[in-house]
A protein has these predicted regions:
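PRPP-associated nucleotide enzymes
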Residues: 1-149, 154-184, 196-212
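His/Asp/Glu-enriched short active-site or ligand-binding loop at hydrolase and phosphoryl-transfer sites
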Residues: 41, 213-227
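Short, well-structured secondary-structure segments
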Residues: 187-199, 214-219
Length: 227
């Protein structure tokens, strides 16, 4: 599995920026492309906007540098975090072509699937499938369908020592635990050290947060102390 976290994305994006002349405007393809686009705009000290705002002629996200006159913009770089089949950028190119701006537009991604020609899209590194990124792994449908998750410290926060009393305080925690990372698609299963006797509360929480799974495996011990 090829994994990239936020820190590695930051480093790779800055390394990418050093190889290219700065544009007048950086455009991020939402959602994931907004992250490297923001890093690039800050590094180059240029204006930033989302693809949708760009298409609508709003060349600023409303803070920091901005262009009062669109005629000031000569070069634009449109950025996404990665490319695989190229469908997202193909759609973005269609929208940009339809907008019919007069300035020069370049296309870039930080990570490509391989070294093939992506139709004038520049990229920084090759990271092959299967790959997961910290900033969007919960929405990776294919990977999630084969994955097995824990709950405490993963889907939700861990209970405090006071909450973890194996009684009513713990039951209240199980029903109301603040979520952390929730899968956006069905997962293969859940394995937890929670006790079997707390299955009703656990299943209620999972249903409340729309977590879909095939199997929930819990520990069959009478008390937390006996685990």
């Amino acid at each position: 599995m090829n994994w990239r976290n936020y820190g590695e994305l930051m480093i790779d994006t800055i390394d990418f920026a050093k190889k290219w002349d700065k544009p007048d405007l950086v455009v991020g393809i939402a959602r994931s492309g907004i992250i490297p686009a923001t890093i690039l705009a800050l590094h180059w000290n240029v204006s930033l906007c989302s693809l949708q705002d760009y298409i609508n002629g709003q060349f600023s996200m409303g803070c920091g540098l901005r262009y009062q006159d669109p005629k000031e913009i000569k070069n634009v770089m449109i950025v996404d975090d990665s490319i695989h089949m190229g469908g997202t950028i193909a759609e973005a190119k269609r929208l940009v072509k339809k907008a019919n701006f007069n300035h020069k537009v370049g296309w870039a991604v930080i990570y490509a699937d391989d070294d093939k020609d992506y139709e004038n899209i520049i990229f920084h590194k090759t990271i092959r499938q299967g790959r997961l990124f910290q900033w969007n792994w919960t929405s990776h449908k294919e990977m999630l369908s084969h994955s097995v998750w824990d709950i405490d410290g993963c889907m939700c926060v861990k209970p405090t020592v006071e909450q973890n009393d194996d009684g009513e305080k713990y039951r209240k925690f199980l029903l109301n635990a603040p979520p952390l990372y929730l899968p956006q698609y069905p997962i293969n299963g859940i394995v937890t050290s929670r006790l079997e006797k707390f299955r009703p509360e656990t299943e209620q929480w999972l249903k409340k947060h729309n977590v879909k799974y095939k199997e929930l495996i819990m520990l069959n011990y009478p008390t937390g102390r006996s685990r």
